[in-house]
Structure formats: C-alpha cells, structure tokens
C-alpha cells in the first residue's frame, strides 16, 4: 500500500528533473538537492510480495529516525535505487544518489525557491507544503509485546 501511494505521488506530474527541497539536521549536515525522501522508524519500509523493501537497515524502535533522501530521479538511477533496496544489506545507503542519515532526533525539510512539494504520512497524501519539521522523542511510548516475541 505504501509503495503504491509513493509511486502515485511520483506519477502526479512530479518534476523529476529539478530538486524540490533541502534537508537539514541540527548539526548543520544536510543536502540541498532532494527530489524524494522517506523518514523511517522501522525497517523494512514495506514488502514487494514476500521480498522486503529495505531502505533503512538502521531504523528500529530503539533508535532515532532514519532519513533516506533521493538526490536524483533519472530513470537509470531510480532503477538502481529500487534494485539496491530490494537487495538489502545496506546497499542503498552506499548509493551516490542517496543521502542517508540514521539515528536522527530532528530534521527540517524545506522547499527550494518556495515551491511547495507533495508529502504523505503512512501512505496518506496530505497535499503540498513548503516545510516539514520532524522530531523523534525517545522513550515516550512503552510497547507491550506477547510472550516469546523476539
């Protein structure tokens, strides 16, 4: 479901030739050429059939957020990115078209040139915006798991 929603967003007259946003972290790191990004707190992101779509191997409920920013949507690079995500084992985070940050407590995504970009949360399209701020609050939720859960 998430994958179909994500692809739907890209198909909606989305400009794949020019970057849409910057991503900034409190330490000053970031990128100014984001086309597409996914922020995760678990991995895999989704499944294609029984195959995990592994974009953030460091993402888990014990760490901060993991931000995966795609810096190019050229057809050849997009195909390589998908293949590496399916391959798993951290292959995607080593791709030169990806900016990867793990264990992040805060980040800001801001439109380039004030041009709004589409965004969604958990597969739900929320419209266009010029700024998204995300924060991770550690240890604010206790999870109860069934006995014998790994």
Kindly give the residue locations of the regions a language model identified.
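Long C-terminal subdomains/extensions of small-metabolite kinases
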Residues: 1-150
């Amino acid at each position: 479901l998430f994958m179909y929603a994500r692809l739907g967003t890209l198909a909606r007259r989305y400009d794949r030739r020019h970057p849409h946003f910057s991503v900034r972290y409190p330490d000053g790191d970031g990128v100014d050429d984001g086309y597409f990004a996914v922020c995760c707190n678990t991995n895999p992101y989704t499944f294609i059939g029984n195959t995990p779509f592994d974009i953030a191997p460091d993402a888990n409920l014990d760490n901060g957020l993991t931000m995966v920013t795609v810096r190019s949507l050229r057809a050849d690079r997009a195909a390589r990115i998908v293949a590496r995500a399916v391959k798993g084992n951290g292959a995607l985070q080593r791709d030169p078209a990806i900016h990867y940050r793990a264990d992040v407590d805060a980040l800001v995504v801001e439109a380039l040139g004030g041009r709004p970009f589409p965004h969604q949360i958990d597969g739900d399209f929320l419209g266009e915006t010029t700024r998204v701020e995300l924060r991770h609050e550690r240890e604010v939720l206790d999870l109860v798991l069934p006995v014998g859960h790994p």
